[in-house]
Amino acid sequence: VTPETLDHVALWVADRDPIADFVTSRVGMHVVDRTDAFTLVGSDARRGKLTLFEAEGPRERGALKHVALRVSKLDSALGSLDGTQVDRPRDGEAYMDVSEGLRLGLVEAPTEVEYDLDHVALWSRTPEETAEEYLGLGFSPASPGPSGAPRVEVGGAFVEFHQGEPGDPERPLLNHLAVLVESAEEHIAEARDRGLEIDNIVDAANTYAVFVWGPERVKVEYVEHKPTFSLT
């Protein structure tokens, strides 16, 4: 399995509009696509995005600690957050609670695209072991980040594993993590060969994807953009 980038983080939320309104008015994203089922937001359709799926509430944070976006100048980005309660645990980082348990971060680092995905932080009972298991899903090894938590890398973005209880909520906030691949068909064949637990295969208008259950019941999507993919 050879993912290219961290394509999106998908969430289940009871009301997607407050989150979509916040990220489009405060953190440089726009609505890439909206259907009856979901709203897709990002600063660039071909970079890291958030997918907000409508689902029955209330949702529980479960495995998801936070999602962090990358900016080249944090102070400038914070200027758009006037009136928002912001936590600054370390230099170059800021975190805020948005809605329905979603905690969003901003991390200062060199970036080709402002507000691209920097990292996703997950709770894990065994962070070191979980990071090791993600290598088998195509993620690359990486040194710990500023938080000191074990992490893996894909296309310059990271997944961090923080010591904590992910639980097994009936209505989790996190739907799945999605990585972009060249061929979903190859990943389907490899998943079957390796005995990975496939949750679903979806052949949609612009994408073709396979969903696999990862460690601690976090779902990973391997998604291929079809030639018809023209979202902006």
Q: Over which residues does each language-model region extend?
A:
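Polar/charged side chains located within well-ordered beta-strands of beta-rich proteins
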Residues: 51, 160, 175-176, 221
